[in-house]
Amino acid sequence: MSRIGKQPVTVPSGVDVTIDGQNVSVKGPKGTLTLDVAEPIAVTRDDDGAIVVTRPNDERRNRSLHGLSRTLIANLVTGVTEGYTTKMEIFGVGYRVVAKGSNLEFALGYSHPVLITAPEGVTFAVETPTKFSISGIDKQKVGQIAANIRRLRKSDPYKGKGIRYEGEQIRRKVGKTGK
């Protein structure tokens, strides 16, 4: 039995969960999220109102999907109650970010500014010209946008210039030495 999959997902008050076959819909104070659970996995509610994820047998694929499905449902519940936020930093002379409506405009040393559009359900907040955050209820969307932005200018191992997650440590390299 999967250690993660066998744990029930507790549903806090103010959150409404609808299970329709393989479709799980979670509605909370921040919005609504839905998930299509993979075919052999069964999702039910127990007497306490918690969500229970079960698998029909111990095939390798079913074991893999068991813990994954439970975690994805738990992420839906957390998303509609608390939401997800990723904070990012920009390092480098002249590198900065500016909010343009619901979009972000980056100056990253290229010959042109880079514009990132916020997808539906994701918001950007610029604290300083070198610090910004990405917020939303869908963990996958927030993480994917953060990864896409980080990829615009990855941190350089020699000078440390670039975009990185807040608190991320970049492994620095020593440059060439002269004779």
Curated annotation (Swiss-Prot):
Q: Name one Pfam family in it.
A: Ribosomal_L6
| Database matches in PROSITE patterns | RIBOSOMAL_L6_1
Q: Which GO terms describe its cellular component?
A: cytosolic large ribosomal subunit
Keyword Ribonucleoprotein present in the record's keywords: the answer is yes
The record's GO molecular-function terms, alphabetically, read: rRNA binding; structural constituent of ribosome
Q: What is the superkingdom listed in this entry's lineage?
A: Bacteria
> Which of UniProt's keywords are assigned here?
Ribonucleoprotein, Ribosomal protein, RNA-binding, rRNA-binding
UniProt record, GO biological process: cytoplasmic translation
Q: Does the keyword Cell inner membrane apply?
A: no
Q: Where are the transmembrane segments?
A: none
Q: Which InterPro entries match?
A: Ribosomal_uL6-like, Ribosomal_uL6-like_a/b-dom_sf, Ribosomal_uL6_a/b-dom, Ribosomal_uL6_bac-type, Ribosomal_uL6_CS
Task: List all disulphide bridges recorded for this chain.
Answer: none
Subunit relationships = Part of the 50S ribosomal subunit.
Q: Name the family.
A: Belongs to the universal ribosomal protein uL6 family.
The family database entries (NCBIfam families) matched by this protein are listed as:
L6_bact
Primary role:
This protein binds to the 23S rRNA, and is important in its secondary structure. It is located near the subunit interface in the base of the L7/L12 stalk, and near the tRNA binding site of the peptidyltransferase center.
Q: What is this protein called?
A: Large ribosomal subunit protein uL6
What is the originating organism of this protein? Mycolicibacterium vanbaalenii (strain DSM 7251 / JCM 13017 / BCRC 16820 / KCTC 9966 / NRRL B-24157 / PYR-1)
Q: Which gene encodes it?
A: rplF
